[in-house]
Amino acid sequence: MKASAFLLGGSLLLALGACDTTRQQTEGTSQSTAETVTSPTMAAMEKNGIRLTPFDDSPKYPEAQMRLKTPPSGATVPSGAVAFDYDLTNFVLTKMSSGMTGNEMAVSEKGQHIHNIVDNQPYTAHYTTEFTKNIADGQHVVLSFLSRSYHESLKHRGAYDLRVINVGSAPVQPLNADLSAAHMFYSRPKDTYSGNDTKKVMLDFYLVNTTLSPEGNKVRATINGSEFMLTEWLPYTMEGLPMGQN
């Protein structure tokens, strides 16, 4: 029987906050999403047998761009399956990504793809520029971003899209979402990991209109009750997770 670790978004908690680390809501001055990601300055952190290590050896694809053509921002679309259509430049879907650390973790055999997140729910991965996705009636915030084959997000400007759409013809309750404010979206880990994929598990999240620093916004990651303060917007490897649900 294969050993497996179950890693669900509800049990790994992330909170974005300003310099006062006792508060969990977003505070402080909003900043543009980082265009480049520098080499890690944070050291590995370890608590209660869980080790969290930033890494930055993945290919950057700085010229990769994504544009969501459909549905238009603010549009109202029919109930049911919503059609998405993207234009991509300098990024090849289904290609396998290089990167030493990333390829030590769970990898999609289908290659590079698009992550589509609705209302901060678990993402769906898509390997073509056109697809449909069932979305409930109402108003929704949709984040899309480019992803390497091992599910690490591209974090530069132009590699993501954030917009509000309306599904269905019935009157909707406005979300009053301020897309110019600072936002954080959870991405990885997701679902069930087995075999060698349990040894190192990626933690990745997406920031919009902000970045992280020791003096500014930080992310509090709570893993099995242990808190880690993250001051760099980078992917992290998690090691030492016990088998079972985390």
Residue ranges and their predicted role:
Residues 15-18:
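C-terminal motif of bacterial Sec signal peptides marking the signal peptidase cleavage site
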Residues 20-22:
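Bacterial signal peptide processing site
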Residues 34-79, 167-195:
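Short, compositionally biased P/S/T/A/G/V-rich stretches that sit at domain boundaries
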Residues 82, 86, 136-148, 205, ...:
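Short, well-structured beta-strand segments within conserved domains
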Residues 114-116, 219-221:
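Short beta-strand elements bearing conserved aromatic residues within extracellular beta-rich modules
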Residues 147-155, 228:
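Short acidic/polar inter-strand loop motif in beta-rich domains
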